Amino acid sequence: MAERSYDFQQRLLQVHRPNRRAEKPLGEGQIEITSRWRIVAPGDGGLLDRTAADLQDYFKVSMGVELQITPETGADHVIFYEIDPALGKAESYRVAVSETAVRLIGTDPRAAAQASYLLEDLCNFEEAPYLSLAFHDRSPIFRCRMVHSGYAEDQFPDEYLRAIAHCGINSILVFVCDVDRSPTHSFSFNDLIARANAVGLDVYAYSYLKSRIHPDEEGAEAFYDGLYGKLFRACPGFRGVILVGESVEFPSKDPHTTGRLRLDNIGPDGQKIIKDKPSPGWYPCYDYPQWLDVVKRVIRRERPDADIVFWTYNWGYQPEKERLALIEHLPTDISLQVTFEMFEDGLRQGVPSRSVDYTITFPDPGKYFISEAHAAKRRSIPLYAMTNAAGTTWDVGVVPYIPTPGLWLRRFEKMRTYHEICGLCGSMDGHHYGCTPSMITDLSKAYFTENDPDGEKILERILQRDWGSENLEAAKEAFALFDAGVYDLVVENKDQYGPLRIGPAYPLVLFEDEKIQLPCVPGSHHGGNLICLPHYKYRNALRDPAERAQLDGGIRALGVCAERMLKGAAILRGLLSTLPQAKRDEAARIVGIGEFIGRTFLTTHHVKRWYKEKMALVYNEGDRTAHLAELRRIAEAEIANARATLPLVDFDSRLGFEPSMDYMGHRQNIEWKIGVMRRILDEELAQPEK
């Protein structure tokens, strides 16, 4: 049965997946949680009372066991919460299992709540309410893991907040244009903060506040107090603020820049006024420390412990000397955030590839990150990273996550390495495409702990849990194909801001559609052509030998990547009938994601071939009739690919959606694209004399 638009949101509100119990014997050294057991709640109306109710719901919904909640602690067969600050480092927790009691211990109530969620994880891996008689310890390696909403931009229903907390993530992000104002709508920040805090989550303000005054101008302190001081006076519950160049740039006096905000450098003709310099948001300006000092000062008058996170995303491509010079002068009582993989060059299938924006095709840290991580360590500045560890990137923009667990595990291992050598202590786990609980969040939660877990073993347990031990080898083969299909993707900006962003809804345009506008949901933050450009082009791909080799190499590589993804999806699809009904729906969604990614790669393959033939006509290169015939073949192949995508987006309403763009790749947009291409076939390509 086809889902309607936004039906996926109801799935995000399902904190506990139903009917996870399998019939199996109790193992040696295990106990069974039966209806004889009770959950002890403190009775103070606080976090652990809510956590106890959550645990009761888990056992009922997922395991089919009815447990009572009681204030009594003295009886046998009880599950109860303890606070023990001496357990270990901050936020450590333990599930201590004995014959007659399960103690959920944390260094504070939030940690004890995580112990409760760990108990759920242990039972999920067992596929039964069975627990091993042991101490199950966790000590998170990151003090901060933050995500935007995957439900809808800046929208966090209570159940979704609970689901995020179950992922081991402890902070959420909200875009801020003013008090109670995000880019798309108004709402109460204080209400969100209270609801998030109620389930153990902090809230960070992602600043869109406009910094129009230089910090040494007269009245600067009052101006910034009217922005950041005002925000934190009205909403003192914000844990901190994210400051990234493109969103908070100020009129710097650094001579390497325009000295103007980006939009202030656009003339009446729509062209840049100063053309040979970057805007201050895209350069490590020498006066950013001065700007940070005033922003920090006005915020901390209202909240002394506010976490001021300064993110160097926009100038990672600038020379290392200038970047590190800025870090040498930053205040040390802020947090420095550096993007993990960007601006790194490599080869994929012999073709040059560059991680121009968020990607898991480069799971390792880039030179930009490494240089700034070591600089932060030298200065004793707390180090965060933009890692996308919740599982989504711009490799494909309208899927809930990229199901490449091998690549994600490799990234997680490198994150651990930099935790150990440079003190990496925070992670932005996703940008505005948000967080969807998945096998990737299960993997990160289990792996990001101090006790040096075996990531490969964790991954194998996840695959066994979700696909069955009898299907383990086939599942491994399929996910290895997904890993290889994404890893060998040739990353280019024009693809991430083109067909990879919206998938098979991306149109192949010829000559009459040069000003085409992508259809979008009215009021969406990044809808239409704002962050997806339908005018696909290289600078001079047919005349420049290097660009032509890049285009040809990309065509070849994308064909291989698409084939791998579709083959992996076919293997998993063949396993669906062997799974219990309770597992089949989620497994089918993974199949759909894999196939959708494959069809997105195939669309991108066709886009590049189409562009090559189109430009051959422009330059009168070769046999015109042959080029026209090839364009017709490509158009028919892409129409078939788009039609094959329709059942995927019908089955899973999350495919084709991204919170900031809303729906850009769903059935309506795919059908629109097919109509565009059918018109080209019936009109432009049917009249070759034109």
Predicted features along the sequence, with ranges:
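Substrate-binding groove of N-acetylhexosamine-processing glycoside hydrolases
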Residues: 1-21, 26, 49, 233, ...
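Contiguous, structured surface segment used for ligand recognition
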Residues: 2-140
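Hydrophobic beta-strand segments of well-ordered beta-sheets in folded domains
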Residues: 34-40, 76-78, 145-147, 170-172, ...
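Structural motif
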Residues: 40-45, 80-85, 105-107, 149-153, ...
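Solvent-exposed, polar/charged alpha-helical surfaces in well-ordered, non-transmembrane soluble domains
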Residues: 53, 57, 61, 117, ...
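Short, solvent-exposed loop/turn and secondary-structure capping segments
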Residues: 115-116, 253-256, 347-349
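N-terminal small/glycine-rich loop or linker at the start of catalytic domains
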Residues: 133-150, 208-211, 384-394
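Substrate-binding cleft of carbohydrate-active enzyme catalytic domains
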Residues: 147-148, 152-310, 321-328, 335-338, ...
